[in-house]
């Protein structure tokens, strides 16, 4: 390995202005860490320089550093910025070897897709599954509801509202990893307990709600199973199954940790519950994960991102 090179020296070669605070982040040890970085704080530059420092000091090759962010545009820009500056360091003799300077920077969803493509067969998921959009998901839900014949299923809303409720329930249950069978079992136990109670308005309302919940779960499960049968996945399916795979097949985490020595997570405040389940199952056992985020800039709350995500980082990724 070449002589150690500091973050300040790297900044000088690449023409980047760097603060003492940024230097501390760039040169942090290989342990889990969360960085609170507000707008205009230079977090992207800091992440890029972190990669340069790791590579130049021999901690990891570019291909062994995984970077995740939310948009393809941000991923592409960060990837090119890092490659360009790695080339600068190599031309200055600060990086030895002839290995590729390409760093795997991608979106969270792209990474989930990679997990399914590589390991999906372990869950019976077609590795060549077609990724479908919201319009197709809506059409499939409408078709299943039209063909659903059950005298006990009475929904007093419009058909459009029924579809929206079904898709909303399906999305939320996958986002939070809810076991539909467990909910059905619990609901049925409550129904069995109150079955002998006298018929009163409140009791009848509870019975109706529980029966409707059971039917909604059954339809939701049918909808998801139908997509899998067709070799199709929605974006929510993709993340749900990637998280499920990571949690249930320990070998997947072992292989991913061997592949990526260091993980960088951008815009961590916007990660959803299913994304966190996937990431903690893969890299949550003391692996060098650095998350960068600003709790005051969360914009994806509607996707399942939670305010406490950054606060919970030490519990999700213990050192």
List each language-model region with its residue ranges.
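Generic alpha-helical segment signature
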Residues: 44, 134, 159, 209-216, ...
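Conserved RecA-like helicase ATPase core segment
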Residues: 2-10, 14-15, 43, 52-53, ...
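A cross-family signal for key residues in well-ordered alpha-helices
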Residues: 26-27, 243, 280, 311
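Catalytic glutamate of the conserved HExxH
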Residues: 267
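Hydrophobic positions in the central parallel beta-sheet of the AAA+
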Residues: 35, 256, 263-264, 290-291
């Amino acid at each position: 390995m070449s002589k150690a090179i500091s973050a300040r020296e790297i900044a000088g070669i690449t023409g980047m202005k760097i603060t003492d605070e940024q230097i501390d982040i760039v040169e942090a040890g290989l342990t889990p860490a969360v960085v609170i970085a507000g707008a205009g704080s230079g977090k992207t530059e800091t992440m890029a320089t972190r990669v340069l420092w790791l590579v130049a000091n021999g901690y990891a090759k570019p291909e062994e550093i995984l970077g995740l962010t939310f948009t393809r545009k941000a991923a592409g820009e960060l990837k090119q910025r890092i490659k360009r500056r790695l080339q600068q360091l190599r031309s200055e003799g600060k990086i030895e070897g002839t290995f590729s300077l390409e760093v795997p920077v991608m979106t969270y969803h792209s990474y989930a897709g990679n997990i399914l493509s590589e390991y999906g067969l372990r869950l019976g998921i077609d590795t060549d599954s077609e990724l479908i959009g919201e319009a197709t998901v809506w059409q499939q839900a409408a078709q299943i509801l039209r063909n659903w014949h059950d005298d006990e299923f009475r929904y007093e809303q419009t058909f459009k509202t029924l579809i929206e409720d079904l898709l909303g329930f399906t999305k939320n249950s996958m986002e939070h990893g809810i076991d539909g069978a467990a909910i059905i079992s619990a609901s049925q136990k409550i129904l069995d307990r109150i079955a002998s109670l006298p018929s009163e308005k409140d009791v009848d309302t509870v019975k109706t709600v529980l029966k409707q919940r059971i039917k909604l779960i059954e339809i939701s499960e049918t909808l998801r199973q139908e997509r899998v049968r067709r070799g199709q996945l929605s974006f929510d399916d993709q993340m749900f199954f990637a998280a499920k795979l990571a949690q249930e097949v320990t070998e997947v985490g072992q292989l991913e940790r061997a592949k990526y020595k260091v993980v960088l997570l951008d815009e961590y405040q916007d990660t959803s519950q299913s994304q966190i389940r996937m990431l903690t199952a893969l890299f949550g056992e003391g692996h060098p994960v650095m998350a960068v985020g600003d709790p005051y800039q969360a914009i994806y709350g509607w996707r399942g991102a939670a305010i406490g995500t950054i606060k919970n980082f030490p519990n999700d990724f213990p050192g």
